[in-house]
Amino acid sequence: MPDATLPACFLGLLALTSACYFQNCPKGGKRAMSDLELRQCLPCGPGGKGRCFGPSICCGDELGCFVGTAEALRCQEENYLPSPCQSGQKPCGSGGRCAAAGICCNDESCVTEPECREGASFLRRARASDRSNATLLDGPSGALLLRLVQLAGAPEPAEPAQPGVY
């Protein structure tokens, strides 16, 4: 009888603990993730004007990207939320999304990406919901200003982003 108690206890313990081992498992298990709709990632950065792209990456059109800084600390909260999220306008690079003008980020790093530098249409789409900004330029004057800013910009390095503000 005592010889059967140990295996029975082991099987009982195994049955109780064979659930999902990840900290933020969705309801219904890991395979139910594909059924969930993606939500927008948490706001971050100064004034909440950015969006989280990873546990230590916060990017916004007006801000650029913060990688591994205090502005990106809020992004660690995404690890504890049960549903997946997605930030950025369009896909770029290898599994990344356009985070700011000319910057492509995935959940681990950011790189400069020419395909994320669409010009005025990118900025206008990203800010279309921001009606509180009375200085938003549209039309020919906005296009001219954007072109001047692009011409004044220095060539960007093709190396991966290092921790800091970009």
Swiss-Prot record:
A GO molecular-function annotation: neuropeptide hormone activity
Entry comment on modification after translation: A shorter neurophysin molecule (32-123) is called neurophysin-I and is derived from the complete protein (called neurophysin III) by proteolytic degradation (in vivo or after extraction).
A single Gene Ontology CC term: secretory granule
A single GO BP: vasoconstriction
Top-rank taxon, per record: Eukaryota
Gene3D superfamilies tied to this protein: Neurohypophysial hormone domain
Residues the record lists as Glycine amide modifications: G28
Cleaved signal peptide residues: 1-19
Pfam families: Hormone_4, Hormone_5
UniProt keyword annotation of Secreted present: yes
PROSITE patterns in alphabetical order: NEUROHYPOPHYS_HORM
SMART domains (alphabetical): NH
Keyword field: Amidation, Cleavage on pair of basic residues, Disulfide bond, Glycoprotein, Hormone, Secreted, Signal, Vasoactive, Vasoconstrictor
Ligase listed as a keyword: no
Glycosylation positions in this chain: N133
Residue(s) at site: Important for agonist activity on V1aR/AVPR1A: G28
Purpose: Neurophysin 2 specifically binds vasopressin. Vasopressin has a direct antidiuretic action on the kidney, it also causes vasoconstriction of the peripheral vessels. Acts by binding to vasopressin receptors (V1bR/AVPR1B, V1aR/AVPR1A, and V2R/AVPR2).
Family the UniProt entry places it in: Belongs to the vasopressin/oxytocin family.
PANTHER family for the chain: NEUROPHYSIN, VASOPRESSIN-NEUROPHYSIN 2-COPEPTIN
Assembly: Interacts with vasopressin receptors V1bR/AVPR1B (Ki=85 pM), V1aR/AVPR1A (Ki=0.6 nM) and V2R/AVPR2 (Ki=4.9 nM). Interacts with oxytocin receptor (OXTR) (Ki=110 nM).
Protein known as: Vasopressin-neurophysin 2-copeptin
UniProt organism field: Sus scrofa
